[in-house]
C-alpha cells in the first residue's frame, strides 16, 4: 500500500467516525431536549421518557429538527396553557442540549 492509499483510508475512517459521533450527539441531544420539553409540560418518569422517544422518532423523519420544533411548539400550545416559551427560547434550549450531549459523549466542538 502506498502512503497515498494509507492517507486515503485514514481520511475515510476519520470521516466515518465523525459521522457516527455526530449521529450519537444528535440522538443524545434529542433525548435531552425531549426530557426538557416533557418537564415543561409537567410530565415525569415514564411519561417523560415516552415523550422524549416520540421526539427522537420525529427527528429521524423527513424534516428532522424542524419536525421536532413544530411538535414541541404545538404540544406547548395545546397542553401548556399560559406557557410562555417562544420559538427563540426553544431553539436556544435545543442548542444547550446539543452542547450537553457533546460534553456527555466527550466530543470536542
Regions found by a protein language model. Name each.
Residues 1-109:
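A charge-rich, low-complexity, intrinsically flexible signal that marks solvent-exposed coils, linkers
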Amino acid at each position: 500500500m502506498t502512503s497515498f492509499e494509507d492517507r486515503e483510508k485514514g481520511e475515510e475512517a476519520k470521516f466515518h467516525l465523525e459521522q457516527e459521533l455526530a449521529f450519537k450527539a444528535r440522538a443524545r441531544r434529542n433525548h435531552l431536549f425531549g426530557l426538557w420539553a416533557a418537564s415543561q409540560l409537567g410530565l415525569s418518569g415514564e411519561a417523560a421518557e415516552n415523550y422524549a422517544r416520540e421526539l427522537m422518532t420525529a427527528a429521524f423523519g423527513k424534516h428532522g429538527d424542524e419536525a421536532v420544533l413544530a411538535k414541541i411548539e404545538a404540544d406547548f400550545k395545546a397542553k401548556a396553557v399560559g406557557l410562555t416559551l417562544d420559538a427563540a427560547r426553544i431553539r436556544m434550549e435545543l442548542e444547550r442540549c446539543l452542547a450537553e450531549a457533546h460534553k456527555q459523549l466527550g466530543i470536542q466542538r
